[in-house]
From Swiss-Prot:
<dbReference type="InterPro" id="IPR001906">
    <property type="entry name" value="Terpene_synth_N"/>
</dbReference>
<keyword id="KW-0456">Lyase</keyword>
<feature type="binding site">
    <location>
        <position position="312"/>
    </location>
    <ligand>
        <name>Mg(2+) 2</name>
    </ligand>
</feature>
<dbReference type="Pfam" id="PF01397">
    <property type="entry name" value="Terpene_synth"/>
</dbReference>
<dbReference type="GO" id="GO:0009753">
    <property type="term" value="P:response to jasmonic acid"/>
</dbReference>
<dbReference type="GO" id="GO:0016114">
    <property type="term" value="P:terpenoid biosynthetic process"/>
</dbReference>
<dbReference type="GO" id="GO:0000287">
    <property type="term" value="F:magnesium ion binding"/>
</dbReference>
<feature type="short sequence motif" description="DDXXD motif">
    <location>
        <begin position="308"/>
        <end position="312"/>
    </location>
</feature>
<comment type="function">
    <text>Sesquiterpene synthase involved in the production of viridiflorene from (E,E)-farnesyl diphosphate (FPP). Has no activity with (Z,Z)-FPP. Can act with a low efficiency as a monoterpene synthase with geranyl diphosphate as substrate.</text>
</comment>
<dbReference type="Pfam" id="PF03936">
    <property type="entry name" value="Terpene_synth_C"/>
</dbReference>
<dbReference type="InterPro" id="IPR005630">
    <property type="entry name" value="Terpene_synthase_metal-bd"/>
</dbReference>
<keyword id="KW-0479">Metal-binding</keyword>
<dbReference type="GO" id="GO:0005737">
    <property type="term" value="C:cytoplasm"/>
</dbReference>
<comment type="similarity">
    <text>Belongs to the terpene synthase family. Tpsa subfamily.</text>
</comment>
<keyword id="KW-0460">Magnesium</keyword>
<dbReference type="InterPro" id="IPR036965">
    <property type="entry name" value="Terpene_synth_N_sf"/>
</dbReference>
<keyword id="KW-0963">Cytoplasm</keyword>
Length: 555
């Protein structure tokens, strides 16, 4: 008997069991990433040239004389994805810029482009600047002056700056509306590469984009610029390709681990998305020093996907109750209580976290794995509540739904797990995160409501009534569109909380907070246009995966 058939047979006792099978599409990638052979000669050649270019770039980065020059240099280096080589230099430059005129009252630079760039970059690095700096571009009614309309680059920078807004910043709300309207109107009449930049920005704002995805895009755009810096460009291309080699090695490791588990055969009801899981981690951190962290996080995402599908797309209540209890006990001796198919994922789950403890023991950090275990137990408890609602046909009030569904968004778990492989993440950082700070709550909310919008139609088609959208419609007697608009409004509020949470002073380091910000960015990209890019990666994620993990940049 084939394994899949054997599984179905074993999961039936005296009576036919009706299971909520979701019928997920197979992996897009097959064995494509299972093996990767590093060309050491090419890698060594890249490293050698990069070291030379790095010194040249450092010198050029520090050579800016005017504020506009300094900001443009920082912006280009960051967009090209090579800023991680110059973190201290950039921090020192921005600290100097901020402290010279913290209220930005000097009128040396009154142009919209420079001020908008200054505002966005400093905010993204945690410096608070008042939106009042834009008042010089507004009329008595708070509207942006129509005389700005010919300054397309200025308006484009204003548009990008508007996405770092926090609560109560009406000027930035007006900036977003003004810049969006004028960019949409101007886009068809612009020449390349500016037309491409405007169209791209309207589709995906820089602040909410996955940095590595943005890097790949910007390298191609920057190459078209007449005033491009050839040293920067070559450095960026070589660095992208060298880092891509590391990413391919890591993906190969994750893919082989996934293949060895053989869930595709033994648990055919679940999604086969190991490649998409790894892509997710590249959004959290792409830099080379986070290699171990990426592999750990990718494996965790793949594992929680299996657990999620067990609750959501296969298990029945009596099985799930035992499964939930076994995970709370976290003891391999519990395995005999489980149905055969659950034994497979239960053992794999415990083995995975044992591996984490072994890996981290080398750095004396094995104790932090407990924080990730507790988050795993938490999400499983909430999955069980959700599964009971679905199976029993219960539709909770929206407040009850959200109190449970925030955990099942996975972001409490994934944020905690993202710190495991970060050697700079201390026990104090894990303790801070365990208390669910406001920025984490915002990120979890963002993930939940955007996921609910994107998956509503599919879940409705499967007979799922306990969805956030359905609960809101029932509670408030409104249409689907009104409910979706409300959830979108909640997402915008959450983004403002995230933006506020990275502003100084902060209780933890910028490196810790950046993981949370990047997880928010992944949601914006993965669920673009209300599509579930994880479950159905062919439209949304496939082009990004090809750009980052298949195609290298021509040197």
């Amino acid at each position: 008997m084939a394994p899949a058939a054997a599984l179905m047979s074993k999961c039936q006792e005296e009576e036919e069991i009706v299971r909520p099978v979701a019928d997920f599409s197979p992996s897009l990638w097959g064995d494509r990433f299972h093996s990767f052979s590093l060309d050491n000669q090419v890698a060594e050649k890249y490293v050698e040239e990069i070291e030379t270019l790095k010194e040249q770039t450092r010198s050029m980065l520090m050579s800016g004389k005017t504020l506009a020059e300094k900001l443009n240099l920082i912006d280009i280096v960051e967009r090209l994805g090579i800023a991680y080589h110059f973190e201290k230099q950039i921090d020192d430059m921005l600290n100097h810029i901020f402290n010279i005129d913290p209220n930005f009252e000097a009128h040396e630079y009154n142009d919209l482009c420079t001020l908008s760039l200054q505002f966005r970059i400093l905010r993204q690095h945690g410096y608070y600047i008042s939106p009042k700096i834009f008042s010089r571009f507004q009329d008595a009614n708070g509207k942006f002056k129509e005389s700005l309309c010919d300054d397309i680059r200025g308006i484009l920078n204003l548009y990008e700056a508007s996405h770092v807004r926090t609560h109560g910043e009406d000027t930035l709300e007006e900036a977003l509306a003004f810049s969006t309207a004028h960019l949409e109107s101007a886009a068809p009449h612009l020449k390349s590469p500016l037309s491409k930049q405007v169209t791209h920005a309207l589709e995906q704002s820089l602040h909410k984009s996955i940095p590595r995805v943005e890097t790949r895009y910007f390298i191609s755009i920057y190459e078209e610029e007449e005033l491009k810096n050839d040293v920067f460009l070559r450095f960026a291309k070589l660095d992208f390709n060298l880092l891509q080699m590391l990413h391919k090695q890591e993906l190969s490791e994750v893919s082989r681990w996934w293949k060895d588990l053989d869930f595709v055969t033994t648990l055919p009801y679940a999604r086969d998305r190991a490649v998409e899981c790894y892509f997710w981690t590249m959004g959290v951190y792409a830099e080379p020093q986070y290699s171990q962290a990426r592999v750990m996080l990718a494996k965790t995402i793949a594992m929680i996907s299996i657990v999620d599908d067990t609750f959501d797309a296969y298990g029945i209540v009596k099985e799930l109750e035992v499964y939930t209890d076994a995970i709370q006990r976290w003891d391999v001796s519990q395995i005999d209580r489980l149905p055969e198919y659950m034994k497979i994922s239960y053992k794999a789950l415990l083995d995975l976290y044992n591996d984490y403890e072994t890996e981290l023991s080398n750095d004396g950090r094995s104790d932090v794995v407990q924080y990730a275990k507790e988050r795993m137990k938490e999400i499983v408890r909430n999955y069980f509540v959700e599964a009971k609602w679905f199976i029993e046909g219960y539709m909770p009030p929206v407040s009850e739904y959200l109190s449970n569904a925030l955990a099942t968004s996975t972001y409490y778990l994934l944020t905690t797990t993202s710190y495991l492989g970060m050697k700079s993440a201390t026990k104090k950082d894990f303790e801070w995160l365990a208390k669910n700070p406001k920025i984490l709550e915002a990120n979890v909310t963002l993930c939940r409501v955007i996921d609910d919008i994107a998956t509503y139609e599919v879940e409705k088609g499967r007979g799922q009534i306990a969805t956030g959208i359905e609960c809101y419609m029932r509670d408030y007697g409104v249409s689907t569109q009104v409910a979706m608009d409300k959830f979108q409004e909640m997402a915008e509020t959450a983004w403002k909380d995230v933006n506020e949470g990275i502003l100084r002073p902060t209780p933890v380091s910028a490196k810790i907070l950046t993981r949370i910000l990047n997880l928010a960015r992944i949601i914006d990209v993965t669920y673009k246009h209300n599509q579930d890019g994880y479950t159905h990666p062919e439209k949304v994620l496939k082009p990004h995966i090809i750009a980052l993990l298949v195609d290298s940049i021509e040197i």
